[in-house]
């Protein structure tokens, strides 16, 4: 990993936990093709009550996040956008969506802006997962969503004409290395990440089976070995500040740090970037179970990077309640599950 910093100017953020509602609502997503690679999503609250949820990493997010999964011949097409981690308390109103029972909203986006579809041909599009519910601007639960599946006959030439959402030449001012208080904070976070990831790897291999099952829903030796391998890879990456597979920015190179985003990863380039509130809102290490901190945020982001351990993780369940409700296969592919497990091992939760 190579450390880099750039000038950034964004505002403030924080953290939290989850609790499933008594009568769990759900969101239904209807996908349709507008033209070639341009897609419309209609999101409907199918529950009996009004819900408010975070739409970061979801439909309505203006950033190039993963809203749908794309498949060609049953193989997933690599995603070229960003995966971000946001605070789970103190959320600003502009990243929250409120839907009355039966209400809908629409979102239109071009899937070719975050995936290479220049080959053309048939592409299958679908989406499912959970999004965080909120109360008083704090994550308080989660709501599942699922979509229909559509097949698109993609014109490769037209797809090639769609501008990429992220242009690597558009980076802001880049300074040679981290400096000052941010350099100190990040170096501390990286050292803590090494310790947390190694301890969590050992716990995955031979620690409490009940704790492992709490997060990964199995005690199989194969799964424990897989989790340990990813965590040890994270520890190696965090310990290599002048080499390694990732480039780590102390600031925001692409302008995706809004006032609620702690950090983000560009998996296609193995780039990790911290946002202002990573430094202002997070402690170096959490003192309570399931809380966010700098070290587990860095750990979370490293699991997204396929250069650290392939394949990189997604964001399938955010926060303790959502993450521990996932199946084994989804937990293995969920960044927050690794961060939460490391926190639990560190604090003996």
Swiss-Prot record:
| Active-site feature positions | 301
Q: Which UniProt keywords apply?
A: Cleavage on pair of basic residues, Disulfide bond, Hydrolase, Metal-binding, Metalloprotease, Protease, Secreted, Signal, Zinc, Zymogen
- Specify which residues bind Zn(2+) according to the UniProt entry for this protein: 300, 304, 315
**MF GO annotations:** metal ion binding; metalloendopeptidase activity
The record's Gene Ontology biological-process terms are: proteolysis
SMART domains linked: Aspzincin_M35
Location in the cell: Secreted
Report the GO terms under cellular component.
Answer: extracellular region
Annotated propeptide span(s): 20-172
What EC number(s) does its UniProt record assign? Answer: 3.4.24.39
Q: Which residues form the signal peptide?
A: 1-19
The record's comment on cofactor binding reads: Binds 1 zinc ion per subunit.
Cofactor(s) needed: Zn(2+)
> Which cysteines share a disulfide bond?
178-250, 257-275
Tell me the InterPro entries matching this sequence. Fungal_M35_metalloproteases (IPR050414), Lys_MEP (IPR029463), MetalloPept_cat_dom_sf (IPR024079), Peptidase_M35 (IPR001384)
- Catalysis: reaction(s): Preferential cleavage of bonds with hydrophobic residues in P1'. Also 3-Asn-|-Gln-4 and 8-Gly-|-Ser-9 bonds in insulin B chain
Enzyme class, broadest EC rank:
hydrolase
- Protein function: Secreted metalloproteinase that allows assimilation of proteinaceous substrates. Shows high activities on basic nuclear substrates such as histone and protamine.
* Family the entry assigns: Belongs to the peptidase M35 family.
Entries under PANTHER family matching the protein = NEUTRAL PROTEASE 2-RELATED (PTHR37016:SF3), PTHR37016
Q: What is this protein called?
A: Neutral protease 2 homolog ACLA_052720
Organism per entry = Aspergillus clavatus (strain ATCC 1007 / CBS 513.65 / DSM 816 / NCTC 3887 / NRRL 1 / QM 1276 / 107)
């Amino acid at each position: 990993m190579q450390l880099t910093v750039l000038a950034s100017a964004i505002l403030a953020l924080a953290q939290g936990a989850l609790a499933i509602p008594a009568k769990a609502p759900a969101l239904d997503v209807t996908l349709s093709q507008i033209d070639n690679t341009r897609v419309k999503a209609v999101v409907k609250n199918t529950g009996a009550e009004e819900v408010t949820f975070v739409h970061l990493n979801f439909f309505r997010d203006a950033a190039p996040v993963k809203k749908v999964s794309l498949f060609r011949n049953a193989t997933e097409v690599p995603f070229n956008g960003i995966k971000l981690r946001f605070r789970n308390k103190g959320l600003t109103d502009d990243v929250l969506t409120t839907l009355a029972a039966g209400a809908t909203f629409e979102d239109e986006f071009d899937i070719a802006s975050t995936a290479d579809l220049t080959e053309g041909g048939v592409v299958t599009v679908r989406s499912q997962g959970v999004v965080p519910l909120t109360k008083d601007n704090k994550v308080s639960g989660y709501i599942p969503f699922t979509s229909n599946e559509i097949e698109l006959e993609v014109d490769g030439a037209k797809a090639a004409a769609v501008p990429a959402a992220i242009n690597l030449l558009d980076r802001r001012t880049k300074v040679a290395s981290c400096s000052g208080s941010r350099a100190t904070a990040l170096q501390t976070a990286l050292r803590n990440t090494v310790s947390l990831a190694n301890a969590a790897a050992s716990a995955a291999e031979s620690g409490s089976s009940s704790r492992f099952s709490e997060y990964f829903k199995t005690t199989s030796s194969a799964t424990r070995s897989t989790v340990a391998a990813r965590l040890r890879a994270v520890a190696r990456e965090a310990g290599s500040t002048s080499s390694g597979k990732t480039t780590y920015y102390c600031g925001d190179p692409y302008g995706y740090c809004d006032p609620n985003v702690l950090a983000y990863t560009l998996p296609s380039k193995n780039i990790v970037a911290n946002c202002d509130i990573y430094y202002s809102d997070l402690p170096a290490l959490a003192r309570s179970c399931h809380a966010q901190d700098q070290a587990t945020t860095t750990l979370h982001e490293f699991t997204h990077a396929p250069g650290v351990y392939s394949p990189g993780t997604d964001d399938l369940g955010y926060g303790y309640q959502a993450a521990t409700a996932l199946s084994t296969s989804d937990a293995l592919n969920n960044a927050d599950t690794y961060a939460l497990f490391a926190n639990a091992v560190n604090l003996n939760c």
